[in-house]
Amino acid sequence: MTTLAIDIGGTKLAAALIGADGQIRDRRELPTPASQTPEALRDALSALVSPLQVHAQRVAIASTGIIRDGSLLALNPHNLGGLLHFPLVKTLEQLTDLPTIAINDAQAAAWAEYQALEGDITEMVFITVSTGVGGGVVSGGKLLTGPGGLAGHIGHTLADPHGPVCGCGRTGCVEAIASGRGIAAAAQGELAGANAKTIFTHAGQGDEQAQQLIHRSARTLARLIADIKATTDCQCVVVGGSVGLAEGYLALVETYLAQEPAAFHVDLLAAHYRHDAGLLGAALLALGEKL
């Protein structure tokens, strides 16, 4: 059976066909619409899936935000151009006439990355550092989603009570500091208005401010990981996302984590499936998990 997997992120929309063998075929992408209207997202999704849906028997969606009763509820609306609510499952069933499931993108990615781990691991946490900061928790070999879909939204835990206001409404969230959007928002002077990718490029060229912004992000993430270790006693933490997988970033996080007391150390791994983890995880969950 072939699954049409869809990944809805703050920067891009991706879709692919995934067979029962887990192989990804016909992957395609579109920019996430910047408009605040549900119609803009619906139109973009229609354009994305229309060439693929005839080859699939079901749809599995991995999306940023809280997924509750098949709908997307944005915890940080800025990550989707201000969109607060979107009926994901209903919309895709109407567009494709196929049975559809939906799950948070980081939760889906966590499940895919868990399948790739070697050894006897039952406790794992996945963190994605990209436009925002998200996560997924596997405990006892099972993915935690929570009754309201909030489980794993670790980017909205407190990093600095005097830090910037986050799009979720809290002050000083990890996401407001460590994410690509947070890195860019803190840039000043010649870097003001630059995106995270540009800031990483400047850091590689020796720009002191760019390097400080990236170190600030990595230090914040390391402290989050120490908190996660204290909370879950996980056996490993897998890091993904465009910032998390940027050259040199994970090594910086490891350096800052090593400065924490030994009890809070944990093995850090780069995401195995990289940018395809959300797609694959959603398809795997459609195969055998009740959401």
From Swiss-Prot:
It catalyses: an N-acyl-D-mannosamine + ATP = an N-acyl-D-mannosamine 6-phosphate + ADP + H(+). Keywords: ATP-binding, Carbohydrate metabolism, Kinase, Metal-binding, Nucleotide-binding, Transferase, Zinc. Zn(2+) binds at H156, C166, C168, C173. It holds the Pfam family ROK. The keyword GTP-binding does not apply. Transmembrane segments: none annotated. Pathway: Amino-sugar metabolism; N-acetylneuraminate degradation; D-fructose 6-phosphate from N-acetylneuraminate: step 2/5. Its EC number is 2.7.1.60. SUPFAM superfamilies: Actin-like ATPase domain. ATP binds at residues 5-12, 132-139. GO terms for molecular function: ATP binding; N-acylmannosamine kinase activity; zinc ion binding. It comes from the Bacteria. The keyword Hydrolase does not apply. It is an enzyme of class 2 (transferase). InterPro entries: ATPase_NBD, ManNAc_kinase_bac, ROK, ROK_cs. GO terms for biological process: N-acetylneuraminate catabolic process. Belongs to the ROK (NagC/XylR) family. NanK subfamily. Homodimer. Catalyzes the phosphorylation of N-acetylmannosamine (ManNAc) to ManNAc-6-P. NCBIfam families: NactlManKinNanK (NF047821), PRK05082.1 (NF003461). This is N-acetylmannosamine kinase. It comes from Escherichia coli O7:K1 (strain IAI39 / ExPEC). The gene is nanK.
